[in-house]
Amino acid sequence: MKKIFSLVLCVLMVFALMAGCSPNVDSGDGQTSVQTVEFPVTVTDQIGNEITVDELPERIVSGYYISSSACIALGLEDKLVAVEEGTDQRPIYQLAAPELLETAGNVGSAKSFDLEACIAAEPDLVILPKKAQDYAQTLKEMAIPAIVVSPESHEELVQMIELIGTLTDTVDRADTLVAKYEELLGKVENITADISDEEKPYVYMCGTNSYMTTVPKDMYQSSLIAAAGGKNAAENIDGDSWTDVSYEQFLSMNPDVIIIPSNNMANGQPDYSADDISADPQLSEIKAVKDEKIYNMPYGFEAWDSPVPSGVLGTLWITAVLYPDEYSMEDFAKDAADFYQEFYDFEMDTSAIV
């Protein structure tokens, strides 16, 4: 039933987005005008709420680092009047939109959204994470349009980008971003196309707080592993959030590769190291430990295992880890640098990667 609802919701979102956008028009000289949005526009957000925005938003509040990163990629940083807490600890702000560190207000976190600060920012569009969805109705009653985003898969990340693009009249930029996203995923598909299911390695992705926490089958990070040509070692565990495992479960999974993600903050470091995993006597018989295939995801930019627009780089990096002969870290570093230059307008230091 959940899958059927998701499919219907996706179809409704597509039609809603199409209805709000005027088509590209041939000007008669062979040039095609930039696609624009006609306001008022009505859309369906990612939990099924219908929202109407009467005029082009000029003051945006984003209560979620994922939607904030998407807004920066869409060139909307000048319209962000308030964002989630902790911006001074997220490298992407310093690299791509340092002015937000001085100008943007603080509306708290997904778990503790500050409604009063949000209202004080006088927004004409609010973007909320699913954990703060209850505030959407309150804002609607105050005539402040609010959408809820929940990008827990590649497809839902694309939907979020297109949704924000429609509501902010940045459809052309959103289309360019999605096209790049699909181009990079297509590159990975070509690299892994001839690899049989039996040849694909089992990958265990740790949590940042503990290596005894991992990614169940319905979590976004599981889709990164699959897209990169791997198999989630925890594919038999149900759920869509970080899940604790026992040593017995870890040993039973016996992954070929262990990945330690970055924590999305300035120091980028989780609460443990690869050496801690290698030194744990209860994990000594795991294949990844014996083969010394424990890898730290690069840090200092964004957490590439999260559903931000640059999350596609997480898939590329895992591909380089799993299939270095087909796609090297040097290849990845170039693709990552090109991505950040095009959509975040900064020159990436690739030394931490290669």
Model-predicted regions and their roles:
Residues 18-32:
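Bacterial lipoprotein signal-peptidase II cleavage site
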Residues 8-16:
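Bacterial N-terminal signal peptides
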Residues 61-63, 79-84, 125-129, 146-150, ...:
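Structural recognition of the beta-strand scaffold that forms the well-ordered cores
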Residues 43, 49-52, 135-213, 234-236, ...:
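Extracytoplasmic substrate-binding proteins
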Residues 62-121, 125-131:
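A short, structured surface patch at a secondary-structure boundary
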Residues 1-8:
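Positively charged n-region of N-terminal signal peptides that target proteins for export
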Residues 107-110, 114-128, 144, 246-263:
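Proline-aspartate-enriched helix->loop->beta-strand connector
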Residues 214-242:
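Alpha-helical, coiled-coil/dimerization segments enriched in small aliphatic residues
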